[in-house]
Amino acid sequence: MVQPVFDAAVLSGRADIPSQFIWPEGESPTPDAAEELHVPLIDIGGMLSGDPAAAAEVTRLVGEACERHGFFQVVNHGIDAELLADAHRCVDNFFTMPLPEKQRALRHPGESCGYASSFTGRFASKLPWKETLSFRSCPSDPALVVDYIVATLGEDHRRLGEVYARYCSEMSRLSLEIMEVLGESLGVGRAHYRRFFEGNDSIMRLNYYPPCQRPLETLGTGPHCDPTSLTILHQDNVGGLQVHTEGRWRSIRPRADAFVVNIGDTFMALSNGRYKSCLHRAVVNSRVPRKSLAFFLCPEMDKVVAPPGTLVDAANPRAYPDFTWRSLLDFTQKHYRADMKTLEVFSSWIVQQQQPQPART
């Protein structure tokens, strides 16, 4: 049987769409999503400037948002506007290449890095209408991004690798600053989570959502919670990000000067369930492609994920067992399709794995 191919140049103009992309009624885009979700706008530079009043206000706003739905936006982040523009241009440059060229970086089953489209993965229904390119980023290995891009796509794409190496370095810096805010808001101090993530082993992902002539029947990305620790997203000027909160879907409007930040499952465990990893999705439209840059902060692969002792007491017992990021990543890549219950299902799986197996007779 020939493997189907997601060729955006062909599919984006089709009046019908393959059945694998059609989502059941009740899961497809809904009219209420036109309502905007107003999330706090956090001045991260003000927080770190030493102004006690600014720091207190940022801490309060972040804490309230993370206990409700886990989403906020960050401005005054220090990311150079030209670097952002370069990063978005490189998204265009990569995804408009002929399909065989993109497939040189094809992601293999069970892996989290490489080029992927809807038919690359292990699922056959409710497929996402998108293409992605993902790669690792580690502060301890500055050459990692460039080496990966050159090894998979060729020397001609070295500049693309250099742009994203710079971008990932800035994302790592920003994520550690956000960790200071999260630590302060949880009462464990600025240094706790910053230290935990200083040696991060993170994932950078370029998202490309082609136009779709049946946008009310499919989704760019289905409803899910991020299994990672923290997501820092920069959207282009085409809306599409939606968050499920208070029983309905609402949109976060793009802002060129802001990054959308959301809590992932791993940080929810690190906060002992205090901060929420919230259900979200991406919708598509029939007119123009949508592009976004997503940096997923992750701890080192074998670092034990456990909340600080100050967040655990008789009234707030441990919400999740100890685990490593490697084990959760492996679970979502090989055993489970990430959704709103990933962390709960994974926790049960961990406990089951730790139980002694009955002897065979």
From Swiss-Prot:
Reactions catalysed according to its record: gibberellin A12 + 2 2-oxoglutarate + 3 O2 + H(+) = gibberellin A9 + 2 succinate + 3 CO2 + 2 H2O; gibberellin A53 + 2 2-oxoglutarate + 3 O2 + H(+) = gibberellin A20 + 2 succinate + 3 CO2 + 2 H2O
GO function terms (MF aspect): gibberellin 20-oxidase activity; metal ion binding
Single Gene Ontology BP annotation: flower development
Active site: 290
InterPro entries reported for this sequence: DIOX_N (IPR026992), IPNS-like_FE2OG_OXY (IPR044861), IPNS-like_sf (IPR027443), Iron_ascorbate_oxido_reductase (IPR050231), Oxoglu/Fe-dep_dioxygenase_dom (IPR005123)
Listed cofactors: Fe cation; L-ascorbate
Sequence positions that bind Fe cation: 224, 226, 280
Cysteine pairs bridged by disulfides in the record: none
KW Cytoplasm (keyword) present: no
Tissue spec. comment: Expressed in nodes and the ear of the elongating stem.
Pfam family membership, one: DIOX_N
Ranges for domain Fe2OG dioxygenase: 199-299
Domain of life: Eukaryota
Keyword Acyltransferase on entry: no
Family to which this protein belongs: Belongs to the iron/ascorbate-dependent oxidoreductase family. GA20OX subfamily.
Full protein name: Gibberellin 20 oxidase 1-D
Organism field: Triticum aestivum (Wheat)
Taxon lineage: Eukaryota, Viridiplantae, Streptophyta, Embryophyta, Tracheophyta
